[in-house]
Amino acid sequence: MIIGASEGLSSSSAKSEVKFKYFHNTSASLIHKSISEMAKFVKHYGGKSDTVYGLAGLGDLYVSAIGGRNSQMGKYLGEGFLYKEAKKKFMDEVTVEGAELAIEVGKKLKQDLNEKDFPLMLSIIECICENKKLEISW
């Protein structure tokens, strides 16, 4: 459950690189940062860190990032759409698990997590929960 929560939020960021000029390098950096934050997230909540590097973590992040609903939403957020606008325009009838999770637990995570350690995850949460443009503070 812990790794699923972390992966859902992380995969939303993996496709958000489209707003950056050098998107391949940025995409690689986002994936690296996602994995790093997933490991910290799992440790913070008492999960097993090695899960991050297995199929439930890295494997699921890869699958989600190359074509899942979370990464599709991340692409729209990276293109500059607000969450509510992108949801209504492109994914109105689609469940985006990472976004649903952010809405459900975002407030608690913002209280629990340090922005220095989780800039990517907290940027995604803020973007979705507060319907703001995606700005990654890393």
Residue ranges and their predicted role:
Residues 1-2, 11:
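Mobile gating loops/cap/lid regions near enzyme active sites that modulate substrate access
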Residues 3, 7, 22-28, 32-35, ...:
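NAD(P)-dependent Rossmann-like dehydrogenase/reductase catalytic/cofactor-binding core
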Residues 12-25:
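Inter-helical turn/loop segments and adjacent helix faces that build the functional surface
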